[in-house]
């Protein structure tokens, strides 16, 4: 969207038949259901993207804010709703797990906000996070380093924070956001709780509608989308242009942006030149 808005001739090659990648819908007996992400957080990031290209998110997708951020069940019958209203979340924790757990949850929430405030710009909003950009933010509040709990995994850190194991289990799920295990993921992922507490939205028609909205906006700006396009390799020619092998044909371009798993490049899945 940004490139097309800037006057660049953009062609998107997508292996699947529809936009969105993992953000897709599949048919079921109850109708279409999300098969990837089911809700959206950090709505301002998407609003800012559309504004940058002279558009409005609301014109391309309908987002509806949820009062219940997440509902949790345990086999013993315990249920916990984390809410859009922070005080309601605190009261729900107190009701389900007691006063001590509520106090621990309150401190955890404060620490998650501190981590978010420190690392949002240099890490979460950066396409290429770098330690040199994080250090100045950390120096503004040196105690944040201890809050990061850098020597412990997410599971270890949560085990120390919560005397109630079910709360530790609940927040350990953030490891799945990066495809990791709680025992092997950094404690820093605790900041995701603050991201969720800022608001959770669902997209009318399913999350895939956001992808379709972004596609429509990009098309209006001049971008071209080619689906069922399987790129198997690319290399840079003597002229400086890149040659992409796609569906047994070669396409020429000035630059390549790869939006897949970086490990695929490192392992040579798109040819030795790409790795």
Please state what every model-predicted region is.
Residues 1-120:
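N-terminal glycine-rich phosphate/pyrophosphate-binding loop and immediately adjacent elements
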Residues 6-8, 221, 251:
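Helix C-cap/helix->beta junction micro-motif
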Residues 19-21, 177-180, 233-235, 264-267:
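Flexible loop/turn segments at secondary-structure boundaries
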Residues 62, 168-174, 215, 227-233, ...:
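Beta-strand segments within the central parallel beta-sheet cores of soluble alpha/beta enzyme folds
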Residues 75-184:
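Rossmann-like flavin
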Residues 190-247:
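Helical element adjacent to the flavin cofactor pocket in flavoenzyme catalytic cores
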Residues 245-255, 259-260:
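Core beta-strand elements of the Rossmann-like FAD/NAD(P) dinucleotide-binding domain
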Residues 258-275:
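Flavin (primarily FAD) binding-site architecture
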């Amino acid at each position: 969207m940004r490139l097309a808005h800037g006057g660049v001739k953009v062609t998107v090659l997508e292996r699947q038949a529809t936009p969105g990648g993992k953000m897709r819908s599949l048919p079921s007996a109850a109708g279409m259901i999300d098969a990837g992400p089911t809700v959206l957080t950090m709505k301002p990031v998407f609003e800012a993207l559309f504004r940058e290209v002279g558009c409005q998110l609301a014109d391309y997708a309908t987002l509806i804010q949820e009062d219940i951020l997440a509902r949790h069940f345990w086999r013993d019958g315990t249920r916990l709703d984390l809410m859009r209203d922070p005080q309601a979340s605190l009261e729900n924790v107190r009701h389900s797990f007691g006063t001590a757990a509520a106090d621990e949850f309150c401190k955890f929430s404060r620490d998650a906000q501190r981590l978010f405030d420190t690392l949002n710009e240099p890490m979460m909003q950066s396409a290429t996070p770098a330690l040199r950009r994080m250090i100045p933010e950390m120096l503004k509040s040196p105690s944040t380093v201890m809050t990061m709990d850098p020597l412990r995994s997410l599971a270890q850190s949560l085990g120390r924070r919560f005397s109630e194991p079910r709360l530790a289990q609940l927040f350990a799920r953030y490891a799945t956001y990066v495809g990791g295990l709680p025992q092997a993921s950094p404690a820093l992922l605790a900041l995701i709780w603050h991201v969720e507490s800022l608001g959770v939205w669902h997209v009318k028609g399913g999350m895939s509608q956001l992808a379709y909205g972004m596609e429509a906006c990009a098309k209006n700006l001049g971008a071209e989308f080619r689906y069922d396009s399987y790129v198997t390799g690319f290399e840079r020619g003597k002229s400086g242009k890149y040659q992409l092998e796609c569906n047994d044909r070669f396409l020429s371009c000035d630059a390549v942006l790869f939006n897949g798993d970086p490990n695929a490049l490192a392992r040579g899945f798109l040819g030795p030149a790409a790795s």
